[in-house]
Amino acid sequence: MVKAFTLTAAVALLSAPLASAHYILNILMHNGKQVGGEYTYVRKNSNTYMPSFMEIIDSKDLRCNKGATSAGTKTYDVKAGDKVGLKLFNNEFIEHPGPGFFYLSKAPGNVSDYDGSGDWFKVWESGPTGSPTSTSGWPTYGKYTMEFTLPTTLQDGEYLLRGEHIGIHENRGSLSLYLNYMECAQIRISGGTGTANPSPVSKIPGIYSKTDPGLTFNFWGGKGAYVMPGPAVAKL
């Protein structure tokens, strides 16, 4: 009886970080440095650090998280070709295995007035570089930030920068409990050549279906290659 309890407790302790570590990408990064604080340039939402589950896949909340608002959010100036990204709050790091993404959507005018209902295109993704059933196989695992370089061909203007990380660690067998974490920063891009004609473009919601293999992949014993969810990284 004591032996069984000890084993159960040990398993629970080992799996606790994967199961309980929630986070939010609410700090803007520019050329490797943090700019502002939490929510200075990232839209605040009502979900705080909690994940969203599959019910959000068909909701407009998939754009920038539940209850996201531009009220009080500033817009940050960057140059095409700069490195930008998002940092986790409270010096947390990504403690779930899974893919990371960045999307852009150009506002028709002032990004503070834009709800993200226009076209989105994926500009960056990070999938497994090793086994998708091991945390060490995911480059985003253990990182404090996700960052990428803005294409130099972008059109000048104001954009929503959507960062997303998807935790697949709760998927077991036929049970799909993937976790979506997403936030939107407001940026103003200048200095681009303006020659970009992004393809493909997508609407959000519309980038996923609830049963996409890349969302439902069984981290605890899945077989075969991992298929990245969502559209391809856009050609610019």
List each model region and its residues:
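Histidine- and/or cysteine-centered catalytic micro-motif in compact active-site loops
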Residues: 151, 164-168
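A glycine-anchored, Pro-Gly-centered beta-turn/N-cap motif
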Residues: 150, 155-157
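A short tyrosine-centered beta-strand micro-motif
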Residues: 159-163
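Surface-exposed loop/turn positions
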Residues: 82, 157-158
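Peripheral, solvent-exposed domain-edge segments
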Residues: 2-100, 107-145, 168-236
